[in-house]
């Protein structure tokens, strides 16, 4: 395949455990399994884009070498949430003997928290029955959604969101390989958008690179449909100063002209509020309003009405505090 058409998150996916950035403690502990030649069942938990899938794939590569693809299988539980996927695909893979001289195989089940409770119970029985021939690596965003009998059978690894420095180092490395010039402001924009998710940062870089070899902040915000932090600050200032018309005009521009998703705008407002120096009681009231609006949107309420109502609540709250 022409590398110019390759998705960068795959092109630059680490091939070794040691190449994974921002998860040094986890990498060290996983490497110790490779040295020992043995592996327990594992549960990887953490938000998206922090290296869970990469850790599973590189671990299999280092355990099995050239035969890793024959002894490793990846399934996504969100595709098939029911018990049939456990009875059929998972059990069929787990029961067969490993290829070559491998002592066991590895089955990586991504988004395991999407499995129903009954499916998880069946999975637990499968993990017990075929522990000699297959090790399971489960990945999830929320470990609380994994039943206790599975958690107790796994070594649990909590992947934290990647820090700004880790994101910057990876973006700098990729930019050098792709002959891109990334301005400091654009780098800060990608860190802001990523929120610890390396996939988001790399996708933003690739999207911007299609437009120009010189990456600047405005194009990063534009292609990712994010408001600039200063725009969010202006929206809050207008609302809290009582300027409903000004806040409404800016809200309309962000949602309709720029195409920013309402839930993304709520997330950006929340991030700005948590860092804003302001009356604590007022901050609590505003965050409560954000949470209620986010919930109503998730329930299918009209986004136009809910976002207008949110601005109205901000204006009223700011007016009461003046």
Swiss-Prot record:
Give the UniProt keywords, A-Z: ATP-binding, DNA replication, Nucleotide-binding
The Gene Ontology CC terms held by the record are: DNA replication factor C complex
Q: Which GO terms describe its biological process?
A: DNA repair; DNA-templated DNA replication
Give one GO molecular function term.
ATP hydrolysis activity
The leader peptide range reads none
Q: Which domain of life is it from?
A: Archaea
Main function: Part of the RFC clamp loader complex which loads the PCNA sliding clamp onto DNA.
The similarity comment for this entry is: Belongs to the activator 1 small subunits family. RfcS subfamily.
Q: How does it assemble?
A: Heteromultimer composed of small subunits (RfcS) and large subunits (RfcL).
Name the NCBIfam families for this protein.
Answer: PRK00440.1
Protein name as annotated: Replication factor C small subunit
Q: Which gene encodes it?
A: rfcS
